[in-house]
Amino acid sequence: MVAHGAITDARVAAADILTDLRAGDLLDASLERRAAGLDSRDRRWTQELVYGTLRRRAVFDAILTERVKGGLARIDSDLTDILRLGIYQLLHMRSVPPYAAIAQSVELAKRRHGIGASKLTNAVLRRIDRERDALDASRLPLPTDAIDALALAGSHPRWLVARWVARWGEVETRCLLETNNTEAPLVLRPFGIVRAQLESMLEAAGVSVDHTPLLDDGLQITGGVSLTELSAFRQGLFFVQDPAATLVTRYAAIAPESTVVDLCAAPGGKSFELARIASLVIACDRSPTRLERMRQNVTRLDARNVVLVATDARHTALTQVDAVLVDAPCTGTGTFRRHPDARWRLRVSDLAVTAAAQRLILRAAAELVRPGGLLVYSTCSLEPEENDDMVDHFLAQHVEWTHEPPPYGAVPDAVLDAGRLRVLPQRHGVDGAFAVRMRRAHS
């Protein structure tokens, strides 16, 4: 691990990423930028440190509140992040000796906030190191209020936990929180090759492969693997996609040789799944950066029937097609295990803002479907405002549209709820997803 002065570059990158998040940056973008100069091993180390710290932030703050005189409100937010990173190294990274976790955190605090901050960091982290056996989350003193206790132990915002408990109860909500705090596996989708062939290539390259939940042709890989260094990646023989996203396209069950519009398409996994069946997939996104990344994958996969279009989903100039998939921008509450920053960024008011945008996109998407054609609305949210409520409102306002369940066997019965796709992390062991098929009348 390369040192940045007396501090390793990986730790500097981790602290800088948390600074970026406070400024409003997204985790994926910040990690890509801050870890650009690190080798693959240090990048994985930095990612584990940052993701793990975010997943346990509430627990760490409870620990710090009892050990920082005057509480966390009296110290700088950046110093709080340095302490959080130090705690994660002490309690959860066995590869890091305690003296290194403490010394590096102290030096980082000194460099960024002066000698007083470094002394505080040294005292707090040394005390935590001495008391580590009593600091397991299961042993922490919890609030008497059941929701407060669950939110603290599961390290999620209280308002979200309260919503989920009202919907699913305490036991299932606890399972969801635990799922969100685990590392999401990497799942590969074969492209232009069958699963057995790709599995053989990966195992020959020393990659451990396992089966995936709910899919018989996905490959779940474990261990620190640099995908871009694999020959199968360079040959365009797979792309990365969680089973929940794959289930959305299987649920869609578009007719062979259809012309399909995939609105809000980046990063592109659903477009590539649709391309297996469709004659043409018109993949739309308004972000030039996201489209450029998707363009690179189109080239790598040689997906010749995928055409990219830069457009706002609310205002497109496209003509009517056989089918439209609306993978609507959403709060992403079904993907918190992949995006641990999102739980702390989300506000209850965001639900109304997001739903308003979704209504506009859904209305515009419906205009792109020919008479008799198919409209599929999907999200990676768990929230009813973005899912059932959205679809029910649309169907009530547009009598020419009807809900149409998928063909028998398109997806496992376990993920169907009254003909709608409903994938839940705590029940199915994958990301969350929701989708509904709607058919337009012929005239």
Question: Which residue ranges define each predicted feature?
Answer:
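S-adenosylmethionine
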Residues: 1-443
